Amino acid sequence: MQVKTLLGATFLALSLASCSTVEKVVYRIDVPQGNYLEATTVAQVKEGMTAQQVQYLLGTPVLVDPYNSQTWYYVFLQQRAYETPVQHTFTVKFDQRGIVTETHLDKPLPQVSQQGENNTIIETGEKPKSSWWKFWK
């Protein structure tokens, strides 16, 4: 009888352990990786710009095509707290003189006004100022 009770309690404990929601209690930060791309800066890249101008706007590319050095890849991976990561790839192609001939963005980037903040400051109310001198009086 005790063996059945012990096995039943063990089975119940192990089966309920997977039903936990504790994962969402732990704070996770937003993790941007790669080149941080903003819609406003990507929109400034136009055909006819030089490679130096593109690099000034967007920074060093994450990847330069090893077979064709005239193609630059800017990769931006954004993972917000418990959401699935979203990857944006911006491709810039140059001609032999280093002039932009083509640009391609695989997914639209969120506008700056649409980007939500995960860091909210909670006001607790104002504390009255008290001096430590009151202990000496």
UniProtKB/Swiss-Prot annotation:
It is found in: Cell outer membrane. GO terms for molecular function: protein-macromolecule adaptor activity. GO terms for biological process: Gram-negative-bacterium-type cell outer membrane assembly; protein insertion into membrane. Disulfide bonds: none annotated. The keyword Lipoprotein applies. Part of the Bam complex. Belongs to the BamE family. This is Outer membrane protein assembly factor BamE. It comes from Haemophilus influenzae (strain ATCC 51907 / DSM 11121 / KW20 / Rd). The gene is bamE.
